Design a protein with these regions (language model features):
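N-terminal low-complexity, Pro/Thr/Ser-rich intrinsically disordered segments
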Residues: 1-9, 14-16
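Active-site acidic/histidine clusters and adjacent loop/turn architecture
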Residues: 16-82
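A generic secondary-structure signal marking the coil-to-beta-strand transition
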Residues: 22-24, 86, 108
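Long, contiguous hydrophobic alpha-helical segments, chiefly transmembrane helices and signal peptides
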Residues: 26, 53, 90, 110-112
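Active-site-adjacent substructure of cysteine-protease-like catalytic cores
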Residues: 77-105
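Catalytic cores and adjacent binding grooves of peptidoglycan-active enzymes
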Residues: 94-101, 106-178
Length: 178
């Protein structure tokens, strides 16, 4: 992809060059149980894995509300994307509260149904801000991710790490590929 195609999700100084990123068209089952097509931007090395993972999620009929690139939101605002329950990958941004790049800035992380699967910090704060109802991980709503779920295993069996296994923060939406 080009810098122009990435829009506000990329800027000079980002740790990955646009030429190292690829746009991947993804079929997914929506919350309406119909097939939808979305787009992810990922690192070129991960394209075959990402295609396979999302084909498996599709066959599992795991519901994903929407899949859009970060540039669909003003200034590629991550909070707006998460509040919209948008599944996304590349976004040149840091780790909140840190001076380190997020794996999203390398195209090596995917957040899945982020409103339903919030990131919970040790302080008790969480993102996105409209996810309070989903802090209760005993819920069984379609699209939620839990330890041992087939959807989680599809990622982890492919070598991805799930933020739901972390202790601080616990990032239920987040999968990253080292």
């Amino acid at each position: 992809v080009t810098a122009a195609e990435l829009g506000a999700s990329w800027r000079p100084g980002c740790p990955v060059d646009p030429a190292q990123l690829r746009r991947v068209d993804i079929d997914h089952i929506g919350f309406d149980r119909a097939t939808h097509r979305g787009e992810l931007i990922v690192h070129e090395d991960l394209v075959p894995e990402v295609i396979t993972i999302f084909e498996r999620l599709y066959r599992l009929r795991f519901p994903i509300e929407k899949i859009r690139t970060a540039d669909h939101y003003p200034d590629a605002d991550d909070e707006q994307s998460m509040e919209d329950n948008n599944t996304s990958a590349f976004n040149c941004r840091g780790i909140p509260g840190s001076d380190h790049w997020s794996q999203h800035a390398y195209g090596r992380a995917i957040d899945v149904n982020p409103r339903l699967n919030p990131c919970v910090y040790a302080t008790g704060t969480f993102q996105p801000q409209n996810a309070a109802n989903y802090l209760d991980r005993g819920r069984t709503d379609p699209g939620l991710l839990h330890s041992g779920d087939p959807a989680v295993r599809i990622f982890t069996d492919s070598g991805w790490r799930w933020g739901g296994y972390w202790t601080a923060p616990i990032d239920y939406q987040h999968f990253e590929r080292p």
